[in-house]
A protein has these predicted regions:
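A generic "structured core" feature
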Residues: 1-8, 12-13, 92, 96, ...
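Catalytic metal-binding/acid-base residues of hydrolase active sites
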Residues: 6, 39, 137, 165-166, ...
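Mid-to-C-terminal alpha-helical segments outside catalytic/metal-binding sites
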Residues: 1-3, 18, 24-32, 179, ...
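Conserved, mostly hydrophobic/aromatic
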Residues: 4, 56, 100, 135, ...
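Structured loop/turn residues at beta-strand edges in well-structured enzyme cores
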Residues: 75-78, 154, 218
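Catalytic pocket-lining loop regions of alpha/beta-barrel enzymes
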Residues: 90-190
Length: 237
């Protein structure tokens, strides 16, 4: 179960941020996955629903008090993301993040390392909502990220996606993955590829091998499948 992939088609929807290197067809995906909205302009959610993935993490502007009840009623929507990277919306989205708990939806938090202190405060204020940290908080260096991640992990409502590191970290990514596994525990870590963004720096097989190589036999079932099923309310296969 890949807990973080993107689908897009620039001929259908507009993605102003998408680099030219990613504006081409990629290989077909075969497997179970959670598809995360890629912040296109237009009705991206309806387009994704027509593709019939197993689960969608839908974009929602939580600071604008969207109709979360209607969003939760869409069968494929299993989580919500409001991109916080590059914003100062943590206070503005707080009530929306809290409301997600009432609808049984987790919140995917995509932030950068410098925003970890704000996410720590948000997680504490929204302790009934499951918060999914995307890409380990996009670290740039082990310190001060290491201490900040440990503090965030102290909030038991937070889980961590082992995803997206190769486009953020220069050099060996294993110390970052090892630290995340240590502070969160394998039962609160989810494998994600961030595909096809990750294709800029690695292959799918290489990333899966790196993550799998750090897990014991007993940990693999959780990190590679069962934890994502639990967090996003999916049926076990």
């Amino acid at each position: 179960m890949d807990a973080h992939i993107h689908f897009w088609d620039p001929s259908v929807l507009e993605y102003p941020w998408l680099p030219d290197a990613l504006r081409h067809p990629h290989v077909e995906f075969e497997g179970r996955a959670v598809v995360v909205e890629a912040d296109a302009r237009g009705d991206e959610l309806s387009w994704l629903e027509r593709l019939e993935p197993e689960a969608i993490v839908a974009h929602a502007p939580l600071e604008e008090k969207p109709d979360l009840e209607a969003l939760a009623a869409r069968p494929l929507v299993k989580g919500v993301r409001r991109l916080l990277q590059g914003t100062d919306l943590f206070d503005a989205v707080r009530e929306g993040v809290r409301e997600l708990a009432r609808h049984g939806l987790p919140f995917d938090a995509c932030i950068t390392q410098d925003q970890l202190p704000k996410l720590i405060a948000l997680a504490a204020a929204c302790d009934e909502t499951t918060i999914v940290l995307d890409h380990l908080g996009k670290p740039r260096a082990l310190d001060p990220w290491r201490a900040q991640l440990a503090e965030l992990a102290g909030n038991e409502n937070v889980v961590c996606k082992l995803s997206g590191l190769t486009t953020e970290v220069t050099g060996d990514v294993r110390p970052y993955l090892e630290h995340a596994l240590e502070v969160f525990g394998s039962d609160r870590c989810l494998f994600g590829s961030d595909w096809p963004v990750a294709s800029l720096t690695t292959t799918y097989e290489q990333w899966l091998d790196v993550v799998s190589g750090l897990l014991s036999e007993g940990e693999r079932g959780g990190v590679l499948a069962a934890n994502a099923e639990r967090v996003y309310g999916l049926t076990r296969v």
